[in-house]
Amino acid sequence: VLFSTADPEELMNDPRVDAVIIASPDSLHVPHLKLAISSGKQILCEKPIATSLEEARLIAEEIRTYQKNVGKKMINFGFMRRFDPSYQEVRRLIRSGDFGSPTFFRTVTRNVFSTGITSTGLFTNIAIHDFDVYRWLFDDEWESIQSFYPRNSTLSPEGLSDPLIIIGKLKSGIMMVGDIVAFNNYGFDCRIEVVCEKGSIQIGTHGDVVTQINRVGGVIKAGPMAENWMERFEASYIEELRAWIHEVSTGEVNLDLATVEDALIANEVSAMGLASIPK
């Protein structure tokens, strides 16, 4: 560590700093992105781009103008599941064609705890991972999202609508059924199953990839569960940082790194999901 400061503007403008990672609370992403634009440094900003769609669209336009003036991509966004070895393997298996075309998938993200989360944050902080990674996984765009609150959990803080059920449809016709749980009390639980014409592909709680094809079924790994997402996705964060550092240092664009357009779309889909909740 060369130095420390409580002033983010001082940090970003310091000549000893080559590039900046923004990992501040979600509500500070927009002001910190504005400082990043002023600094002229390359930035990796953790998702979301903003906590509201209006703010997301405004800052996205500022970033577009900034990058157009500079002549290259300067700001990426952190959606680490794109770099998770298990998600990358599922993507490879889907693209192999061996399983036929995907028809629908199930997805689960259940946290032990989600400090400071709000009902809106269930979309912009947690479900936003699903909205991004499945665009990337299927190379597709979202057509519709319908969200529901089932019976509320007694483990959730007062005023929080938790869990959340989401039914989504991609433009290709692939459908999703997913659930988001902010407080579950049993362990970090993140799983998917992609059901294809000729078989299924699953990611288990421990990140193991299991397939069912040609009358041969794999077995999901058992064992102690992670306490939180940082333990489960540690390798994903590291690979994302390596990819970003390589892009910054060499100028070679990594297509898996999320752009401002990816970040904005994730917020737009989150807003679509929030607006779809029955009144």
Residues covered by each model-derived region:
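Short, Asp-centered acidic motifs that coordinate Mg2+ and/or phosphate
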Residues: 3, 18-19, 74, 104, ...
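C-terminal helix-rich "cap/oligomerization" subdomain common to oxidoreductases
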Residues: 19-21, 64-74, 243-279
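A contiguous active-site-proximal alpha/beta segment in oxidoreductase catalytic domains
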Residues: 50-114
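Rossmann-like dinucleotide-binding domain that binds NAD(P)(H)
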Residues: 112-175, 180-189, 261
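NAD(P)-dinucleotide binding in Rossmann-like oxidoreductases
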Residues: 158-159, 171-242, 256
